[in-house]
């Protein structure tokens, strides 16, 4: 209280009046949150000074080095998705490896001198040899062929652009191997931390057969698409398909990887939500809610790490889909206008539906994962009856809601783009704009030719 306040109070009391009340400062939401955090941390220090504090209240407890054997025991996500990781190693796409169970050594690692990388280099060299032969053959045939029709140019542009994705593999995939290893270790540590906190493991139902099915389906779909192009295009030789089999299969496997991880994020969020609901019904759940808040933040960080680890690969993925879809759609419509529908246009539409299907799966699964981890989890928190719990629990629920607001579970490609349903609509609108402009040029050119002939 200032000197002026004391003077006014003395003057009011001496005359039998009520002294003026203390002016309460007006705080904005950020200042109020900071003040409440400081008050709660001071309460924590007082509890610690009296020796009756709970170690996990308010602050994240210090991380400890876990037993690698225990990590392996509870790493059900690795065990159920191991088939896809092994397939990536065989194809030379992502040569990460499992480290021996030693202390202070991450369970998943990446080393340029490992046997997995050496195998990837060997496979990549063999595959690149075939790609170069096919690329040279297609370019030579296109340049020397007397048939310069537009549909021939469209087909060559599409399939040559697909071949170039092979040359981007070391830069887009191998270079980010350490980030992928970090992401895999985050999953391993998260599952064990979840078990220690809740007392029950995360169960991924049907993930093992689903992963195996996707591995087989990825290659079967690649074979089917390439053989369809072989039968629908007279100039597409059978040996060309051997260059495209691993490329299309790689695109399918990356789509499968994205689907599996998004599905696993939703499963982990649902398991955490169920454990939280059970804890809320117990006595004094504030201590556990602090750990649940840390688990949720870790889950949100894992979603962000997925996009960071595969940012270049999925960025290239989206660009290939965008470019191929525009060229194939324009080529098919243009040829139908000029010469009518043929089997070649059917082949172009197969490519269009394939590319748009991949983009839809990636964006739709990312949308569902973000909703399950974010909105659905937040909705369950808001439905908690806070009047039936103590003050510490109420505060922990509020802090968990703040954590969700401050760490939105967004699937982001390292800042390049957010993967959600909006990306689908944006791509479709861009493609429609480009197609309208290109078709306007096409119609104008036809009118000019018609006027000249008349």
Curated annotation (Swiss-Prot):
Principal location: membrane
InterPro entries documented for this protein: 7TM_chemorcpt (IPR013604)
Inducing or repressing factors: The Myb-MuvB complex mediates neuron-specific expression of the carbon dioxide receptor genes Gr63a and Gr21a.
TM helices/strands, residue ranges: 115-135, 154-174, 207-227, 238-258, 313-333, 346-366, 423-443
Compartment(s): Cell membrane
Bilayer disposition of the protein: Multi-pass membrane protein
Key words, A-Z: Behavior, Cell membrane, Membrane, Olfaction, Receptor, Sensory transduction, Transducer, Transmembrane, Transmembrane helix
Single GO MF descriptor: olfactory receptor activity
Phenotype of the disrupted gene, per the record: Impairs CO(2) avoidance of larvae.
Function: Gustatory and odorant receptor which mediates acceptance or avoidance behavior, depending on its substrates. Gr21a and Gr63a together are sufficient for carbon dioxide detection and avoidance behavior. It is possible that the CO(2) receptors Gr63a and Gr21a activate the TRPC channels through Galpha49B and Plc21C. This innate olfactory avoidance behavior can be inhibited by inhibitory interactions of the odors such as 1-hexanol and 2,3-butanedione with Gr21a and Gr63a.
Family, similarity comment: Belongs to the insect chemoreceptor superfamily. Gustatory receptor (GR) family. Gr21a subfamily.
Subunit structure, interactors included: Gr21a and Gr63a probably form a heterodimer that responds to CO(2).
The protein, known as: Gustatory and odorant receptor 21a
Organism: Drosophila melanogaster
């Amino acid at each position: 209280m200032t000197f002026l306040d004391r003077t006014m109070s003395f003057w009011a009391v001496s005359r039998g009046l009520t002294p003026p009340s203390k002016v309460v400062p007006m705080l904005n939401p950020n200042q109020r949150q900071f003040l409440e955090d400081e008050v709660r941390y001071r309460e924590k220090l007082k509890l610690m000074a009296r020796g009756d504090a709970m170690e996990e209240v308010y602050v994240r407890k210090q991380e400890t080095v876990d037993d690698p054997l225990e990590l392996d025991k509870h790493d059900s996500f690795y065990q159920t998705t191991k088939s896809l990781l092994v397939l990536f190693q065989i194809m030379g796409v992502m040569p990460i490896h499992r480290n021996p169970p030693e202390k202070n050594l991450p369970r998943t690692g990446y080393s340029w001198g490992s046997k997995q990388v050496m195998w990837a280099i060997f496979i990549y060299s063999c595959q690149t040899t075939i790609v170069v032969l096919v690329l040279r053959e297609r370019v030579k045939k296109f340049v020397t062929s007397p048939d310069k029709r537009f549909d021939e140019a469209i087909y060559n542009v599409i399939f040559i652009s697909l071949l170039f994705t092979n040359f981007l593999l070391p830069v887009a995939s191998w270079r980010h191997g350490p980030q992928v290893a970090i992401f895999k270790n985050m999953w391993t540590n998260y599952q064990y931390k979840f078990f220690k906190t809740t007392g029950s493991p995360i169960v991924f139902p049907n993930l093992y057969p689903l992963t195996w099915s996707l591995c087989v389906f990825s290659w079967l779909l690649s074979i089917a698409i390439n053989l369809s192009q072989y039968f629908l295009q007279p100039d597409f030789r059978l040996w060309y398909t051997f260059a495209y089999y691993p490329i299309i299969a790689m695109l399918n496997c990356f789509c499968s990887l994205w689907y599996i991880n998004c599905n696993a994020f939703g499963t982990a969020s649902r398991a955490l939500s169920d454990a939280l609901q059970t804890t809320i019904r117990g006595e004094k759940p504030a201590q556990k809610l602090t750990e649940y808040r840390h688990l949720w933040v870790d889950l949100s960080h894992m979603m962000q790490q997925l996009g960071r680890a595969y940012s270049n690969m999925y960025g290239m993925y989206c660009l290939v889909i965008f470019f191929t879809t525009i060229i194939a759609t324009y080529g098919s419509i243009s040829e139908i206008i000029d010469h009518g529908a043929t089997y070649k246009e059917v082949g172009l539409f197969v490519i269009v539906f394939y590319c748009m299907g991949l983009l839809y799966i990636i964006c739709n699964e990312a949308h569902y994962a973000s909703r399950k981890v974010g909105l659905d989890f937040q909705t369950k928190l808001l439905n908690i009856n806070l009047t039936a719990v103590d003050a510490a629990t109420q505060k922990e629920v509020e802090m968990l809601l703040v954590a969700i607001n401050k760490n939105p579970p967004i699937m982001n490609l390292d800042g390049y783009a957010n993967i959600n349903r909006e990306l689908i609509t944006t791509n479709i609108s861009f493609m429609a704009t480009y197609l309208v402009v290109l078709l306007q040029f096409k119609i104008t050119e036809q009118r000019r030719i018609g006027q000249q002939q008349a």
